[in-house]
Amino acid sequence: GAGVEPVVFLSVIGADRTPLVPHARLESWRVEAGLETTFLRASFFMQNLSTTHREEIREGRLAVPAGDGKTSFVDARDVAAVAVRAIQTGSTGAYDLTGPEALDYEAVCHLLSSVLDHDVEYTDPSIPRFLASRYRRDRDFAKAGVMVAIYTTARLGLADRGTDDVRSVRDRPPTDLLTFICDNRSA
């Protein structure tokens, strides 16, 4: 190696089963090169709600083309804690990191509404409408395209898988979405 082993590599959940995502190629390259690596395959970060979707949530809505599909959100703080443990122990392999439950976006909006000082409504825009709206907001078509891919996996029922990997590494349950929302209500 290059004297920088082992490496902890942040990937995406399903990279081992989805060759189209760039993470799959990077994971394969590291394995084929014989490089000691811990792969952290994270589900959808809870932090996306308090960053990427912050303004629309403040406006009382969350518009994503996820249909009634569920997502097993993960707190980036849990992912970071698993990364630290992997570095401390020198463990290698792969961890699929999710939260404790899979929720649809109606349920997400219900949780947001229960904590915030206003109601948040879920709307399920068409993909063209979502792309246009995100482009107007961010001026970044590539980002909007990635978001469509992410929400399409939820729509198709491919984002609802949960694992015990956070619990097994940290000896405590992963953060649930309600706790995350309470911790970040001022965001």
Region annotations inferred by a language model:
Residues 127-187:
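A hydrophobic C-terminal alpha-helical subdomain
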Residues 2-6, 12-121, 125, 132-137, ...:
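Oxidoreductase cofactor-interface core, primarily capturing Rossmann-like NAD(P)-dependent enzymes
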